[in-house]
Amino acid sequence: MNSYWAKLPVVKAAMLAHPEAEWIWWVDSDAMFTDMEFKLPLRRYDYKKHNLIVHGWEKLIYKKKSWTALNAGVFLIRNCQWSMDFMERWSRMGPMSSEYEKWGEIQRSVFKDKLFPGSDDQSGLIYLLYKEKSLTEKIYLEGEYYFEGYWVDILPTYDNITEKYTEIEKADGKLRRRHAEKVSEQYGAFREPHLREAGIGKDSWRRPFITHFTGCQPCSGDHNPMYVGETCWNGMVKALNFADNQVLRKYGFVHPDLLDSNTVTETSFDYPDDGPW
């Protein structure tokens, strides 16, 4: 398999190679972690024994029949027999199948907003959910936080989010302490009470967990023509530095300009508190 379908045999191989792992986490090469303190709510998915977690919305599947009703570029899949069997069904729509072209036609007939003719993994997954609603017993559509989020929507929020987190650190001295990466999870727990009013998802000022550069194709450079010039590249630089600042900040450094990866400045010991001490 090639292109986007190549993830399925890779995930299968990881399952077989690591039977001790309960979950396998697939993240596309064009997706970046942009909240370094976030912890996946795995207990939520264990409660009803969901086996596949993807970012998506039921109304876009069953009412609007959109091929963007979910994003198959980032998903959690439980390492179990159900998952192995499901991926086998899913992959039957892929290029190794003799019915590959037929599946492309079926997908376009159901999802009118699908722009290209070939069968793709995302449309295939949505089609299975659309035809078999009972699959939602095992497939969880995560829409409560940015399990992955569209970069065009997220990038403009970075500056406001940074300001909000700076205000939190000004108000709580223990969050300003420099600390080792090893104890970052505990500092995330210290910060959590301050984020209760931040909300989650699209209108939240909480850091987005994953910023997904859908359509940018960073490996091939063959990005969607709707993104002009250096839009994709500049966006990825900004996201990387936004995430990098969260790590550097622990050691007293920061990128003052998110579009400038080369410049790092030292912060005062009690930054962002300006004193007097």
Model-derived segments and spans:
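Hydrophobic/aromatic beta-strand patches that form the interior of the parallel beta-sheet core
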Residues: 25-27, 53-54, 139, 209-211
